[in-house]
Amino acid sequence: MIGELDFPFLGAGSTGGACGFAVANPPLYGMVSAGGPSVFNNGIGCGTCFQILCNGHPACSRRPITVTITDECPGGPCASEPAHFDLSGKAMGALARPGQGDRLRSAGVLRVYYRRVECLYRRTNIAFRMDPGANPYYISFVVEYENGDGDLAYIEIQPADGEFIPMQEMRSAVWKISSGSPLTGPFNIRLTSAESHKVVLAYNVIPANWKPNETYRSVVNFK
């Protein structure tokens, strides 16, 4: 498929974005992109992966790269094509021939070939980064580094000595649940992928003494 990309977005060391990912850290290493409305898809596109090939400019390497969607490009030029990508500086440089990164970054809007691909984070398992406002009555976290589809259909949380409870997806990669009584850990998290409907269980992944802003890594990922 043919789309367009440009470079007004992130530097290699940037963090955050609408999806809330730590984009400069492994395994992303800054190889990220903001997506136009059809790609970001109201947050459903957070964490999805795309292969991009640039061959319409002399500075293009004509070698594909893979990027993860971590932010939104909401309107204006971003909505002018069926698909639009705003690449990070590092990702834009990776599309270029050796020594031609700055030339490609200054080229403006480029026509590219793209396709959705499965995410593959080697030697990395799913992680849960607790939201700054999370508390025992309001559990919320960002889910990071899912292999495969990269997007999730369902997440369920199981408190200590309790049943699995469905969580609600916010307009990003954040999932939340509110409770009238405090929820106590350790917590099991069950995740269902959106496309393949595969299920993985992260057992006791969030400890009883969890804290906001902390990241808890599981020992599982989609295959």
UniProtKB/Swiss-Prot annotation:
- SMART domains according to UniProt: DPBB_1
Q: Which InterPro entries match?
A: Expan_Lol_pI (IPR007118), Expansin/allergen_DPBB_dom (IPR007112), Expansin_CBD (IPR007117), Expansin_CBD_sf (IPR036749), LolPI (IPR005795), RlpA-like_DPBB (IPR009009), RlpA-like_sf (IPR036908)
Tell me the compartments it is located in: Secreted, Cell wall; Membrane
> Expansin-like CBD domain: which residues?
137-218
Arranged from A to Z, the UniProt key words for this protein are: Cell wall, Disulfide bond, Glycoprotein, Membrane, Secreted, Signal
Please report which protein family the annotation says this sequence is part of: Belongs to the expansin family. Expansin B subfamily.
Name-wise, this protein is Expansin-B6
Say which species the protein is native to.
Arabidopsis thaliana
The gene is: EXPB6
